[in-house]
Every structure is written in C-alpha cells, then in structure tokens.
Amino acid sequence: MKNINITRKITQGMYALTTQNGGCIVDAVSQISFGKNPLISVAVMKNNYTNQLLKTNDKFAISILGKEVNPEIIKTFGFNSSRNINKFERVETTKIEEIEIINNSLGYMICEIVDSIDNDTHTLFIGKLIEADVFEDKEAMSYQYYQEHREEILKA
C-alpha cells in the first residue's frame, strides 16, 4: 500500500517566490548542487499564475521567511493571484536584478532559470544562483510550523 502521507515528513520551508510582475508562497525549494554555480530548484503548481510568469521570464527570487514574518506577506502572496492584484504594492520590497525581494525576510536568492521539468501538477524550475544575501540570522519558518500555527499567523 502506498501511504502518501509520509511526504508530509519531508522538511520544507516557507518562501516567497517572486519574478517580474508577480509571485506566490512556495514550500518546495531545494539546493541541488554546490560549487561555483549552485543550482536551486523550486516547484510551482501548474494552475498558479506565477507558473505562467516564470515560463516567460529568465529569473526568479526566493525570499526566505522567518517564524516572525509579517503575516501580510503570507496573506498577500499565498491567498491572492498576481493576475488580479499587484502584490508588490501591499508589502515592502526592494528591486535587485530586476526582481522584487521581500524586505521582511531572512534573506534572498536570485536565480537565472536554466531548466524546467513538467509533471502532472507542478513545474520544477531549476535556477543558477546569481545573487544572494542574508538579512537576519533568525530561525526560518518550516512548513510544519506554518501548518501548526496557521490560524494565529493569519489572524494577526
């Protein structure tokens, strides 16, 4: 028997994925290589508008969210479509390499898209790390922490 619930035990974080003209909250981000040109992967649901945007852009950014993140970031990027609103008008950002970075984050990674893989529900975008910085050395928010504290985070 295949018990898919075991996948919930895979450690994941909470991230704001941004590209030109939009972004969303993601949890499936991974460093897939080290060395001179590290590769970062991010999985984005196919029915998410940000997925469409990534297919027409050459870069994306990942802002790492901390446990003390401003709840507006999760509300704005997690429960609204960039097709309908300008998310960057609702949260404080800084533009780096033509991509908006979330100011109230632990840090960011900007990647140049080098490949993508489609499956039935998601597209895996693979990017070469071209710019990164750490803003704060605090604890990152895990997906498990978010699920366990979701109500209190979202009502703040």
Regions found by a protein language model. Give the residues of each.
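Basic, polyanion-binding surface patches
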Residues: 1-156
